[in-house]
C-alpha cells in the first residue's frame, strides 16, 4: 500500500479552501444574464466554449491532492443540484463557496464546527420552507417560456420552443433534444402513440410515394404470441371482412403461411390488413401491448387470461381513427379507449415510476407514460458550427430540466431575489447556543451570494444592489440584463422553486461537511529518480579539423 500524507486542523482546511475557491471562481463567472464564457481545452479536437456551470466544474482537476479534494467536493455540490433538478449548478456552487468561506473563518476563530453545522442545517430548513411559501404555480405557456429563457442564459428562442413543445405534448409528454442540420431550432411533434416497429412486409404499403401503409378507422388485433398458422386467424379475418373495416395485427411475430396469406388477401383487396411486431421484449412487451389495448379500447388476446385467436370476436378488438405504418415506426392516432381507463393506467405507471430504483426502467416507464398521456416532441437544435451546436444543445437540455422543475414545484422570482426574500424566515431564528446562532447568521450572509455574483458579473456594485433589493419587498429585484429594478416576475425573470431549493440544500449539505473536516488523507507523490542524459553517440568524421 502506498504511503499517505495526512494533514490536520487548519492546515488541512486551508488547502481544501484553496481548491474550493479555484473551482468556484471558474464556475461562478458563468452566472447570470451577463455571465462570461469559459473555454475548455480538449485532449483532441477544438476547445469547447460554454456558459454551463456543471460542464466547467467537470473539467477541473488540481495537481495538489488536498486542494483537489476541496475542488471535487464542490463538484459534488454541482452534480447533486443537477441530479435533483437538472439545473442550478452554478447557484449551488456559489452558495457552497460562501458557506465554506464564512464557516472556516468561524472555525478558525474558535467556534465549535458541529454546532455551526447544526445552525446551518436549522437555517436551511427554514429557508426551504419559506421558498415553498413564495412559489407560485407555473401554469401558462408564457411562464414556461420565461423559465426556459432564463435557464438557457437569456436565449428567447430556446424558451419559446420549449413552451411550444410542452403545449403540444402536455406536461407529461416526452420532449427529446437532438442535433439538427440547419441553423434554426426546429420542433417536430408525433401525434398519438408511436412505437419503433414497422410493417412486417413491404406488400402492406398502400401509399407508394411515401412508402407507408395507412389504415383509416381500423380495428386492432393485439396478440401476445407468434402467429404462424392462418387457421387460427380465419374467424377474425372473416368477421373483419364482413364489417368492411381495415385490420392491424400487433403480435409477437407473424410469419410463414400466416404472413403470406395476409399479404395475398391485402393485395387482392379481400380484406385490408397490415401486421407489425409488438414493441419491447419480455415483460415490457406485455405491458406495452396492454397500453395499446387501453388506448384503443381493445383486449390483449392472451392464453394467460383464457383468450385464444379461435374464440376472438369483434368486441375484443381495439379501434382507432387512423394508423400509419412506415418501415421503422407505427403510429396509432386517436385510439377509442375510455378516458377513465387511460387515466387509471397512467396512475399505475406513475406509481411504478415512484417505486423503481433503476434509471433505465424509469426512463422506459416515462416513455410509456408520455405515449399514453401526451405525445412525443423532438427539438432539433440548429447552429453554425459543431462547437456552437454542443454548447447550445447543453443549454437546451438545461432549460428543459428547469421548465419541468417549474411545472412540478412552481416558480419564484429569479436573479437571486427568492433567497433574499426567504431570509425573512430566519430573521428571528435562534439556535440552542451561541455557536448555532453564528451558523444561522453565516447562512443569512451566504444566501445573498448568488445575487451579489450576478451583479458583479454584470459589472455593477454588489453591495449597493444587495442593499437596495433587501429594502424592497415581494418580487422587487434587480434585472442584471437591463440594469433596472422592478417586479422580477413581471420582467419575466423566474427560477423554478425546485432548482433554487435543490441548490441551497446541496450547498448546505456539502458545505456543512467541509466545515466539520478535521483531517485529510492523500497519497504521497512518488519520487521518481531523475533520468540521466541520453548517450551522445559517436562524433566520427571530424578528423581533419586541425
From Swiss-Prot:
GO cellular component: cytoplasm
Locations listed in the record: Cytoplasm
InterPro entries named in the record: Chaperonin_Cpn60_CS, Cpn60/GroEL, Cpn60/GroEL/TCP-1, GroEL-like_apical_dom_sf, GROEL-like_equatorial_sf, TCP-1-like_intermed_sf
GO BP annotations listed: protein refolding
Annotated EC: 5.6.1.7
GO molecular function, one term: ATP-dependent protein folding chaperone
Residues given in the record as ATP binding sites: 30-33, 51, 87-91, 415, 479-481, 495
UniProt entry keywords in alphabetical sequence: ATP-binding, Chaperone, Cytoplasm, Isomerase, Nucleotide-binding
Catalysis: reaction(s): ATP + H2O + a folded polypeptide = ADP + phosphate + an unfolded polypeptide
Task performed by this protein: Together with its co-chaperonin GroES, plays an essential role in assisting protein folding. The GroEL-GroES system forms a nano-cage that allows encapsulation of the non-native substrate proteins and provides a physical environment optimized to promote and accelerate protein folding.
Quaternary state and interactors: Forms a cylinder of 14 subunits composed of two heptameric rings stacked back-to-back. Interacts with the co-chaperonin GroES.
Protein family per UniProt: Belongs to the chaperonin (HSP60) family.
Protein name per Swiss-Prot or TrEMBL: Chaperonin GroEL
Originating species: Pseudomonas putida (strain W619)
